[in-house]
Amino acid sequence: MNIDVVLLLEQNPILLIFVVLAIGLSFGKIRFGSFQLGNSIGVLITSLIMGHLGFSFTPEALTIGFMLFIYCVGIEAGPNFFGIFFRDGKHYLILSLVVLITATWIAYFGGYYLNLDYGLAAGMMAGALTSTPVLVGAQDALNSGLAAVPRHMDLSLILDNVSVGYAMAYLIGLISMIMFAKLLPKLQKQNLSDSAQQIAQERGLGSQRKVYLPIIRAYRVGPELINWIDGRNLRELGIYRQTGCYIERIRRHGILAHPDGDAILQEGDEIALVGFPDSHARLDPSFRNGKEVFDRNLLDLRISEEEIVVKSDSIAGKRLSDLNLSEYGCFLNRVVRAQIEMPMDLDIVLAKGDVLQVSGEKSKVKGLADKIGFISVHSQMADLLAFCSFFILGILFGLVTMTFGQVSFSLGNAVGLLLSGITLGFLRANHPTFGYVPQGALNMVKDLGLAIFMVGIGLNAGSKMFQHLSEVGVQVIGLAFLVSVVPVVFAYLVGAYILKMNRALLFGAIIGARTCAPAMDVVNEYAKSTIPALGYAGTYAIANILMTLTGTIFILLS
């Protein structure tokens, strides 16, 4: 049996998609020292080669890819978008606008000066910013008819130009951003790790520690401890401040009880202490030496670890220190915002949608969750009805046409799906039983949508890529470098000398404005801290939204 592989792939577009994906994802795992190509570059290079060999791609599959991607971007941004936009994100909004306005200005006038074909500059800008949302916005504006097609040009030719520009500039944008993250910190007077340490000191940020579940140990109260207590009740003693442990139970004369703040320990009491292993190890000898007891009932406590989503209006906007976790007998392990783990900063301002990983006795963790929000649903079942319904609403919203005199205007699929995704994400953050999609499932849909979209871009661009490289390759690559680097340098100057931002936060914010996650690892390494993640999370959500709008606006201006 003879199988013509080329004919098989040409006649089976779905098979072609997954063959390119498999090869590209494998290629993306290749490392050059500490640098890894990554999934996007691997898939893009593979699809460009396949496109150059003559393989093509159906526009419908390309469309569903970018629709799923941009919709999931909206869902992820939803919980934090409004908080950043309306409350304390002034600096982050300014930096995002500086990057995008500068990039748009350079790309527009650079494309005009170089007389680039229609659509090529838009794709080049998207690639130089390593921003798929910019590309999505530009292509959707063309497909939806929002942007007029010149009479002498065909729509498919313009879309090919957009794809070619993106493919030519993407690698330039990624490498230049990583190099920026490596070089610019070295050019500062102040070391980046010193900037991070300064924020840590100003905000009472302790050193990062390993996270363990609390453990329970039981001790008998002896004469030494009674002398130390000196008649004070538990509230006056401040056991947690002294030891880092909570007293969960007391057995007195054979009776188990949960103590309140007015309780006074007596000699012979057996107490159950809950705390991290390090806290138990640091206990004063009057607590532990020769006094540990094993009492099955006293130790029978259910320690749980839950992810609590901030929802309460009375909590959002307050500092982490205002939670007074010691009153609830709970331990904070992590703070996650927009899928970025934040430093354990007691002065960080909480926002709706923030996830606090908390451990402690089960009933107390539940009590804390009832106060600040809700426990994240630990379910593998997604609310597909809500997911599909808002997807439909996004498409319908993008089809609505508004007329102003002689001018008709519609948002298009990209903006419509982005807005519906933001709405679903926002509602999910405020209503725990509505619209739940496991984060793993959301990541898979988003990554698969992006990968399919990249396959389509590469296959469509591959057939003309080398022709454009020989004709305008040097000009496009040079312009892409300027679009990638100049806005970042300008944003740095604005942030450092006008906004007076801390350098560690500033670098994270600039990378968030560029939505370039690989560069984030480089900055964290130089800062020897995760503090730059505070800035990254601040700009990431708003930048993703603005980039989609930028792609649409740019193609309208061209």
Curated annotation (Swiss-Prot):
GO molecular function: monoatomic cation transmembrane transporter activity
Residues that span the membrane, as ranges: 5-25, 37-57, 66-86, 92-112, 164-184, 384-404, 407-427, 441-461, 476-496, 504-524, 537-557
Ranges of residues in domain RCK C-terminal: 203-290, 291-374
Intrachain disulfide bonds: none
PANTHER family in UniProt: K(+)_H(+) ANTIPORTER SUBUNIT KHTT, TRANSPORT PROTEIN YBJL-RELATED
Family: Belongs to the AAE transporter (TC 2.A.81) family. YbjL subfamily.
Name under which the protein is recorded: Putative transport protein VC_1145
Source species: Vibrio cholerae serotype O1 (strain ATCC 39315 / El Tor Inaba N16961)
